[in-house]
Every structure is written in structure tokens, then in C-alpha cells.
Amino acid sequence: MQVELLNDQGLASSKVDVPDTVFGREYNESLIHQVVVAFQANARQGTRAQKDREQVRHSTKKPFKQKGTGRARAGMTSSPLWRGGGRIFPNMPDENFTQKINKKMYRAGMASIFSQLAREGRLAVVDSLAVDSPKTKVLADKFKAMNLNSVLVIADVVDENLYLASRNLVNILVVEPRYADPVSLVHYKKVLVTKAAMDQLKEMFA
């Protein structure tokens, strides 16, 4: 498999060979879906909470007499049928959303995503994206010159300058290979990988 090598203007200067073990896999939609859903589920904190009829603060006084009003009988205003009452099946803060996915499936899913990105032309290689100063404008101008407005950058090393220069850019995410995740790969329109990061990706997902 070959992908484009981009210059500083975002133009393809040549093509580089990338390992088929990571970038030449078949597209496995069901596996990719499973990996993405599991990653999102495992990122949930599970701290949302609602109150049931016992936890709602309310008066125990009967709202109105049992008979003679023509209305349905009611015992407490905390009933789920009443406005401000408790939920019938509330979400509890100890709910666990964890989904287990083994390492072999995760690696295969990530490789399938990388392969599809390469086939669609959404994956490219750059020599380096190092910046000399932690100024956002420097990196923003570089991406503007490359005509990129939604990009995930996988760099071999994210130093302080690159981190500070990129953290305020909208729709730009710069990560090291170990922090690349399936959701970000699917989300961004373009994925740039430095040459040095390619070797790390090969070791991780081959």
C-alpha cells in the first residue's frame, strides 16, 4: 500500500510505502462499529443520576380526598404520574457502561480503520510538524497553507511547543500514536502521520 507524502503546501510531493499489515486490511464495518461503540462506552463516567419517588423531596400529605372529586385517586405528589414526581426507572450513578473488547479485536479494528482511510485518500504522511515556538498562529498558518480544516495529526513526539500551539485550534487534534483512538480516526476528515510515527503504528497494530 502506498499513501501520499505531503509537503508544507499540502501538495503530494511523492508516495511512500506503508505496511499492508496495518494499512492494507479489508474493510470490516461490523468490527469497526464494535470497536467505536466500546471505546465510547468505556469513556462514560456513569455519574448521571435521577431520583425515584422515595428520593424526591415532597409532603406526605394526601393531595385531595379519596372520593367525591371526580379525579383519579392520589396518595402523594411524589408519584411518577405527577409533575415534579420521581422517575419510575431512574438512572443510578453506580451504573457501569464498560464493554470488554480484547486486544486482538481492537488491533484488527484499528488496522481496518487505517486501511479504509488510506483507500479513501484521507490518510497522508508528512516529514514532520515540529514548530519552533508555542504560537497557535504558526501552526494555524501551516494547516491553512495545506488547506486542512479538520485534521488528526499523529506525531511520533508531541513536545511542549507543538502541544501548546495546537490545543486552541478548532477541529485540529495532535496526539502521539499510543493515544490514537478509533473515534478520532473516524471523526476527522484528514489524518496526517509523521514518518517516525509510522514505525510506531506498525508495531502497535500489525
UniProtKB/Swiss-Prot annotation:
Composition bias type Basic residues, residue spans: 58-70
Start and end residues of each stretch annotated as Disordered: 46-77
Xref: PANTHER family: 50S RIBOSOMAL PROTEIN L4, LARGE RIBOSOMAL SUBUNIT PROTEIN UL4M
NCBIfam families membership: rplD_bact (TIGR03953)
Domain of life: Bacteria
Function noted in UniProt: One of the primary rRNA binding proteins, this protein initially binds near the 5'-end of the 23S rRNA. It is important during the early stages of 50S assembly. It makes multiple contacts with different domains of the 23S rRNA in the assembled 50S subunit and ribosome. Forms part of the polypeptide exit tunnel.
Record's protein name: Large ribosomal subunit protein uL4
Record text on subunit structure and interactions: Part of the 50S ribosomal subunit.
Family from the record: Belongs to the universal ribosomal protein uL4 family.
Keyword Metal-binding attached: no
